Amino acid sequence: MTTTQLNSPQMSDTSLSSAEEKQGSLSAIKLQLEAQLHAQLQAQLQAQLQEWLGPKGVTFSGETFIVPETHDMVKTLFDPTLHKSNFELIILACLFANLVVFAIPLNQVRTLVFIGLYVFWRLSYNFGIGYLLQQQSLHNRLVDWAKEGKLFDEKNKLFWAQFVQHEVKSQRGKDYAINSLPIEFNTWLVFRKFVDLILMSDFITFCCVVYTCAVENASDFTNHWLVWSRVLTGIGLILFNLWVKVNAHNTIKDYAWYWGDFFFRQINNEELIFDGVFEMVPHPMYSVGYVGYYGFALIAKSYTVLAIAIFGHFLQMIFLHYIENPHIDKIYGPSKNEINLIKILKLKDLKSFDNMPPLVGLYNFNWMRSSDLLNLLLVATYAVILPLFSQSTTQYFALTVTTKLIESFGISTLLVLQSYSKYFTKWCLSNDIPVEKSLNNWAVMYNTLINLTYSSLFGLNLMYFLRGSADLLYHDLLYLRIFIGTLLIFTQTWINASIIDLIGYFGWFYGDFFIPKSQSFANHLTKAGVYRYLNNPEQIFGVCGVMGVFIIWPTFENLTCCVLWVLSNFIRINFIEKWHMIRLYGEQEVNQDSGVTKTFKKHLIPEVIQRKISGDEPLRRRPSSPSLADSLDTFIKELTNSKTKLSQQKLVELSQNLSFANSNYKLTIEGLKYNDLKTAKFATLGSPLKVIWQSPLATHSSKDWIGLYRIINTTYSRNRTILSSAGRWTYCPDANGSYVFARNKLFWEEGVYEFRYHLDGKHDVAYISEPFELKHESVSVPLHDDEVEVFALALKEKIFDRLLDIESTTVPIAQVATSQTDNVLATYQLLSSVISTSTKVQISSKIFLKSDQITILDVARKLYDINKVLDELSYDLSIKKDE
């Protein structure tokens, strides 16, 4: 190359242009990095500022504010360093006034007085606090009363207004400006004192009842091992109760402790908290939060205290059911789309049971079902008739044990054979029984054997009770035994009902053993409800009712039955069901730590040992790191909550915790229909679906896209889609627009589906449409030859036109299929599948391969011929034949 060529103007311009491009690229990268760093610093500053100022609250009228720090009940009342308000002084006076009762000389009278006081305060809890909270939840009544009475208006000089304002200022300090915070917060402050009065008085009067009853039974406190075991057990229950209360308060703080979400919402408390003791048991404040009461009863050795504890605990559960739970469902419950999805899945759950709820025990009994009548006769025979007429209790005990052994060995053996070799399914198919029917047949057999075992156990105890010939292993504490035994029986019933509600009849009857995973409705094990706290709740609580029977009637026979039930249940769950679930869902999902295990590790195992244990686990057992979906979810929430005022509609949606409810994105589907019950929407297979999208113009990207997905494959995340759309997607070039999904853009399988709006060519989800079901179009096969052409037109319109552009019913299908599709065999298989399901006449894809000249009219005539043969082979049992 010459010097002239090296120094040519063209080469110089090219080099200069290249350098400028590199410089521009570096500048763009620098600006991008600076923007990212600025955003990160801003987010950190906002987080630190929010932590310093306190949590952010929003009233139900849309006003936002910083929630000030408050103190718990015990610290407020009994910490001498804190200033006491007027209400707090009144509360302390009421508590110390209980000492006046001890001036009564007779201890029995003191006990009656304290019982009366406890009943008064306990009823005040239910009908005082409960009534006020219900009115506040439904009608915002307390806040309205405060507004109507102008209680927080500094211009109001009425006594009650001045008294309430002085009370609030005495709580928050003299410099507290009442109008600086919403009236909802001030009303909550006053309501807290009413709660403090009732709760503290309730507990103090109960302690006084315990003391007076313990004094009455002072002679029972002798130096004996049984006394010490009773006292130590009671102290253990009380200490556990104390830990539950402290842990619960540390987890949910004053906001939830004093029902703050009845008055306003905290931005960072938009979902229920499952941490600490809340991860260990459901509703710990109402369930295990009262075990200390039974500990007091043990220490006092008083049935009076036990009855009072049961009375208080029962009223607390009533409060939970009628006051707390409805508000929880209102604020934190599922969205409308989720409710519709649950309804659809529950209806789908009955598909394997002839679309009727199957018999569980004697629940769902149907007089028109022969298997139900048979179960009723067997239960009556084993539970009542045989015990009344049997002459030998020993023989009936042998019958009970034999029945349980047959049930245990038979059910377990069939489950093992089904798990490893699909024995039961193969038998059903060999006898021309569809796979869907196999689960129903199994359910009838399984439930019948279970009914036989429990009815025989009931009959055995009925026989001993009527004859009074049983030798009890323990005779004392009859009423305590009855209470504990009844509680265990009730617990087993409740646990079983909860399990069925969560996993459906499909899961209750081991549907995973009989129905292929691809046809089931969930690809993941549930971790909701009772399964949030225990991986296998039925392992203990599934047989605790039998333990309760033994406690009530402690005989050798009941002890033997109890051991049999526990061993059978343990073996079936741990050595059959668990291993099948591992093969089906994977070891990582099956062996996840339950809530109880997590709490146990957190509080009882040192952190060093925990790190050692987690370090020894295989990589596949370690939890995955947080995904970017959480960042997107937080981003959308921050956009919504950044305003100082929220619209009424957005506020309602926020209070109901609707997924994507506050998003500026929206998807609307045209072409859906309501089912007969008006409970869910559906479309027929192949019907075009028009999707209309709306997105904010400022943030819209031409790479935004919409995809169609099966819900059972995307339930793992509502904020990010990892599953491929398999071509069922389209770009959204404009901020607002529509697109018609048809043919290969649709799924051709029945199921529940949804559309997802994704951002900027990525898989971050901005909006999810309402769930809808795809169903097969029903096409009736004619009974007469002259209706075949009409039938062919129906096939063309409802099936063929949705896959191929065929001009008429006499055009060869192969001619069109080969020119319009890339995979002819797949098209033929899809056509045969849809036709078979829609007409309920099974045909094979080979029908299209036998001749290249076959037309839609030929297919219609073939279906007519098959149906005619099947109709001739069948007959109507309701029509009597001529003899």
Curated annotation (Swiss-Prot):
Q: Which residues form a coiled coil?
A: none
Instruction: Give the UniProt subcellular location, in the record's own words.
Output: Endoplasmic reticulum membrane
Q: Which PROSITE patterns match?
A: S5A_REDUCTASE (PS50244), SAM_CHO2 (PS51598)
What InterPro entries does this protein map onto?
Answer: Phopholipid_MeTrfase, Phosphatid-EA_MeTrfase_fun
Please indicate if the UniProt record lists Endoplasmic reticulum as a keyword.
yes
Enzyme Commission number: 2.1.1.17
Q: Spell out which residues lie on the membrane's Cytoplasmic side.
A: 107-111, 215-223, 301-302, 394-396, 463-469, 561-883
Which reaction(s) does its UniProt entry say it catalyses? a 1,2-diacyl-sn-glycero-3-phosphoethanolamine + S-adenosyl-L-methionine = a 1,2-diacyl-sn-glycero-3-phospho-N-methylethanolamine + S-adenosyl-L-homocysteine + H(+)
Q: Which GO terms describe its cellular component?
A: endoplasmic reticulum membrane
How does the entry describe its membrane topology? Multi-pass membrane protein
Quote the pathway field: Phospholipid metabolism; phosphatidylcholine biosynthesis
Its transmembrane ranges are 86-106, 112-132, 194-214, 224-244, 280-300, 303-323, 373-393, 397-417, 442-462, 470-490, 540-560
One GO biological process term: methylation
Stored Pfam families: PEMT
UniProt keyword annotations, A-Z: Endoplasmic reticulum, Lipid biosynthesis, Lipid metabolism, Membrane, Methyltransferase, Phospholipid biosynthesis, Phospholipid metabolism, S-adenosyl-L-methionine, Transferase, Transmembrane, Transmembrane helix
Top-level EC class, please? transferase
Q: Which residues lie on this side of the membrane: Lumenal?
A: 1-85, 133-193, 245-279, 324-372, 418-441, 491-539
Q: Which GO terms describe its molecular function?
A: phosphatidylethanolamine N-methyltransferase activity
Top-level lineage group = Eukaryota
Its signal peptide is: none
What this protein is reported to do is described as:
Catalyzes the first step of the methylation pathway of phosphatidylcholine biosynthesis, the SAM-dependent methylation of phosphatidylethanolamine (PE) to phosphatidylmonomethylethanolamine (PMME).
Q: Which HAMAP family match?
A: PEMT (MF_03217)
Q: In which family does this protein belong, per the annotation?
A: Belongs to the class VI-like SAM-binding methyltransferase superfamily. CHO2 family.
Name of the protein this chain belongs to: Phosphatidylethanolamine N-methyltransferase
Source organism of this protein record: Lodderomyces elongisporus (strain ATCC 11503 / CBS 2605 / JCM 1781 / NBRC 1676 / NRRL YB-4239)
